[in-house]
Amino acid sequence: MIFGKMKSLLAVLALALLLAPAAQAAPAKLSSAWMGEHETFVAWYAKQQGWDKEAGLDLTMMPFDSGKNIVESLAAYDWAVAGCGAVPALSTPLSDYLYIIAVANDESANNAIYVRKDSPILGAKGTNPSYPNVYGSAVTVQKADILYPKSTSAHYLLATWLRILGLSEKDVKLQEMEPTPALSAFTGGVGDAVALWAPLTYEAEAKGFKSVANSKDCGITQLVLLVANRRFADQHPEQVQAFLKMYMRGIEALRAKPAKELAVDYVRFYKEWTGRELTPEMAVADIQSHPVFTLDEQLAMFAPGGSVQKALNEIVDFSISHGSFTPEQIDKMKGKTQVAARFLEAIK
């Protein structure tokens, strides 16, 4: 009888040893690419809480200066997921290798064009009656020297602003420059205007620069998207879904907690990611000015005829007018074959 009990005990121990590796399996490493801004804070905050590990992931986060650089880095860094603006997600050459899997936020109020406080551009407002809050005129903006990041949301805003004023990019002098060095150059006296996105917009305002146009006042929607490496997502859909669960948990935290409570973490995040200072007041403003969307809201946005489709249609038109695309590429962009709502649908 004792021998029988020992055999049973040994069998239980053997089974426990077999199951232990599965129970203690290391989280899957998931590489990701981001900019030092709002959508990245959501992922950073979720990782700080350990929510990536709870989702079975070990999220690594690589920093970049722009969404264009993120997409162009895909071949070199082979990241799995990323956050970037809709313009580079749709129009950058490697965008064919991406899926659009979710919306990180709406940054329409946070892309803006700045001038110095003595700029003649501030002397005219609402010259186009359809856009009463937009500054500038064909006379004051023509031949202006403008610093901007090409093929980005800020470029989309710049082109729209010029169109509102009856101008085109041929009517001004454009200097292609990433936002951080562009703000430094503008501060040093280079250029007549600079196109930026948040949180650099708050730094521009702190320096006394004045906004003459933002995306919201210009009537365009600027969505920041979550994208996935198409090859990786096809091979590991469960990891992409786990990432979305983690990110949606971060969005729920932003919706539930007052911005003032999150500001301390946001200031720390910004310092870690950019090496630059952000005041608690700026952090609160940035959190409050970036709407984020729950899973149910996102599913509605991604539905046929939803707001995502409308916003992407407008950006496709902009991208086609500003790029050299083959008919096949144009058909792909118009067909929005990159949009993959199935990853969101899988985590309902």
Q: Which sequence ranges carry the predicted segments?
A:
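Pocket-lining segment of extracytoplasmic ligand-binding domains
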Residues: P181-E272
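Bacterial N-terminal signal peptides that target proteins for export
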Residues: M1-A11
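Secondary-structure end/capping motifs
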Residues: D234-S324
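Extracytoplasmic/secreted envelope proteins and their assembly/folding machinery
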Residues: T40, V71, A86-A89, H155, ...
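Solvent-exposed, acidic/flexible segments
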Residues: G36, P63-G67, D106, S151-H155, ...
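Short, glycine-/small- and polar/acidic-enriched structural segments
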Residues: A26-E169, K173-E176, D192-A195, N214, ...
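Bacterial N-terminal signal peptides
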Residues: L10-A20
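Conserved C-terminal helix/tail region of periplasmic/extracytoplasmic solute-binding proteins
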Residues: Q309-K348
